[in-house]
């Protein structure tokens, strides 16, 4: 994200402060959202959050699709990055508080600890594949301006930089649908076991 913002919004962009938007929104909203979803199942809360993730990525993609800056003194790239991060933080508020609860409910009695340990496998895999994919996409759609002789040549090469976010929106949508299917399948299996 920092390289994308600096390359698209310019060297004067300061993406460091944008990273603070996520924890700010989470701290402000997690209690309210947790209370709001308290009567719902953990999987329902998680699914709401999972379907917010692709919306977040699509908002981030809108940054260089908009015309003139919407807010004076702030590039649309920065504005839409903030909007996307806000939605992503809201998704986190729906997912995180109920995530471990859901995994512990899936575990057979006495194996909760092992299941909770494996619940973090996604973080490990996403850090490997996500960072690699981000680097490949950044190189393809938003290359380093230093590699070009003119600003115009770089602008032509990075004209579709927003495509990066479409990949992440697609991954988020696939993950949301996969979680929904997983919940339906495990619910069906659990019903058969009770019969």
Q: Regions from the language model: what does each represent?
A:
Residues 3-27, 48, 79-82, 159-166:
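Loop-to-transmembrane helix entry
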Residues 5, 93-108:
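Intracellular juxtamembrane helix-capping segments at the cytosolic ends
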Residues 12-13, 78-79, 104-122:
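Loop-to-transmembrane helix entry/capping segments in MFS-fold secondary transporters
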Residues 28-48:
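Helix-to-loop junctions at the C-terminal end of transmembrane segments
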Residues 51-73:
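C-terminal ends and interior cores of transmembrane alpha-helices
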Residues 62-64, 158-195:
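Multi-pass alpha-helical transporter architecture, strongest
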Residues 70-95:
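Hydrophobic core of transmembrane alpha-helices in multi-pass small-molecule transporters
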Residues 136-173:
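A membrane-interface helix-boundary motif in multi-pass transporters
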């Amino acid at each position: 994200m920092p390289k994308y913002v600096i390359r698209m919004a310019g060297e004067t962009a300061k993406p460091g402060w944008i990273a603070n938007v996520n924890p700010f929104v989470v701290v402000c909203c997690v209690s309210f959202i947790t209370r709001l979803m308290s009567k719902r199942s953990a999987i329902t809360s998680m699914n709401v959050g999972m379907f917010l993730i692709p919306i977040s990525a699509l908002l981030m993609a809108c940054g260089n699709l908009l015309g003139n800056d919407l807010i004076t003194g702030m590039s649309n790239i920065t504005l839409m990055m903030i909007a996307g991060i806000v939605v992503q933080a809201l998704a986190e508020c729906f997912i995180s508080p109920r995530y471990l609860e859901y995994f512990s409910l899936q575990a057979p009695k006495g194996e909760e600890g092992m299941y909770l340990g494996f619940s973090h496998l996604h973080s490990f895999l996403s850090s490997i594949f996500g960072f690699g994919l981000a680097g490949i996409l950044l190189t393809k759609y938003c290359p380093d301006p230093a590699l070009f002789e003119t600003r115009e040549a770089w602008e032509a090469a990075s004209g579709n930089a927003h495509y990066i976010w479409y990949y992440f929106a697609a991954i988020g949508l696939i993950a949301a649908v996969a979680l929904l299917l997983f919940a339906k399948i495990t619910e069906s299996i659990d019903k058969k076991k009770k019969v």
